[in-house]
Amino acid sequence: MKIFDTHCHIADPAFDEDRAEVIARFRESGVCRANVVADPCEEEPNQEKVFSLVEKYDFLCASIGAHPHNASRYDAAAERTILEYLNHPKCRLLGEIGLDYHYDLSPREVQKDVFDRQLELAWERRVPVQLHIREAHGDCMDMLRARLAAGRMPSGIMHCYTGSWEAAKVYLDAGLYISLSGALTFKNAPKLQEVCRNVPADRLLIETDCPYMAPVPLRGRRNEPAFITNTLAKAAELREISPERMAEQLYENALRIFGLRDEV
């Protein structure tokens, strides 16, 4: 059984003490690929650490972008860094980018400007995006509809999706994949479970978003890629198929959107 963790933060300081062991555990669990996220606009930019890590392991790839929390720090230098790393052979996506109105760590208008700018970069470079949208689906949908109307909408992924099925249909119509995290296993997630049941088989992905969002029965612990098997099992249960068939479909989907071949 092959599993692709499409969004993780294993370069995070939370893993500094045991990163090699974490990687060994997820390889043993069936996770044979993982995407590691970089952000040049963090207070401590991590792109060098991320890309050093993915260069070390052939089964890792990377994405890079300015998270909406960090939109206020996006400038010409950050954009140059993103464009530089998009040329890296192991960089597959631009992200995570988007809108986060839960914390409002950057002003909303700044978030929207930076989000739209990065969508444009992705369109120009013909790379998929990885979107982080929290409590901002209305504005996000408006922006994506405008890009669709202009014919400048990149392909991509709704990362760690927690919205409704009605909203998911809009994102699917925009050509995006829906990626589900450990939140799928939570007891208070009936709407998310409805999404899992209904997303077309060829547009569904899973991820850990570790070290956050650990699934039941591990909720509250530091999350890691090996825990994704719990999310996989829940997705298979909801879709009434075997975990093996679920893993196969999800893996095929991930290879497709990441533009990778099954060589690891």
Regions found by a protein language model. Give the residues of each.
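Mid-domain alpha/beta scaffold segments of enzyme catalytic cores
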Residues: M1-V264
